[in-house]
Amino acid sequence: MTTAFQFALFALIATSFLLVVGVPVAFASPGGWSDNKNIVFSGASLWIGLVFLVGIPNSFIS
């Protein structure tokens, strides 16, 4: 259980870093929002899912 929690936490941190770097790059690219909105929404959905995936087990582990 602890290993799965640590992996989910690492995935959350990695996804957060990718979104912090990737979203401004997506907005600054020539196509802008219209070409990259699916990628941004997919990343945001993954991030929200990981927040719940980390938050729920954290209440049992801590």
UniProtKB/Swiss-Prot annotation:
Give the CC-aspect GO terms.
chloroplast thylakoid membrane; photosystem II reaction center
What InterPro entries does the entry give?
PSII_PsbZ, PSII_PsbZ_sf
Q: Which gene encodes it?
A: psbZ
Role description: May control the interaction of photosystem II (PSII) cores with the light-harvesting antenna, regulates electron flow through the 2 photosystem reaction centers. PSII is a light-driven water plastoquinone oxidoreductase, using light energy to abstract electrons from H(2)O, generating a proton gradient subsequently used for ATP formation.
The lineage, from the top, is: Eukaryota, Viridiplantae, Streptophyta, Embryophyta, Tracheophyta
What parts of the sequence cross the membrane?
Answer: 8-28, 41-61
Query: Known Pfam families for this protein?
Result: Ycf9
The protein's name is Photosystem II reaction center protein Z
How does it associate, per the subunit comment?
PSII is composed of 1 copy each of membrane proteins PsbA, PsbB, PsbC, PsbD, PsbE, PsbF, PsbH, PsbI, PsbJ, PsbK, PsbL, PsbM, PsbT, PsbY, PsbZ, Psb30/Ycf12, at least 3 peripheral proteins of the oxygen-evolving complex and a large number of cofactors. It forms dimeric complexes.
What species is this protein from? Adiantum capillus-veneris
Q: Keyword annotations for this protein?
A: Chloroplast, Membrane, Photosynthesis, Photosystem II, Plastid, Reaction center, Thylakoid, Transmembrane, Transmembrane helix
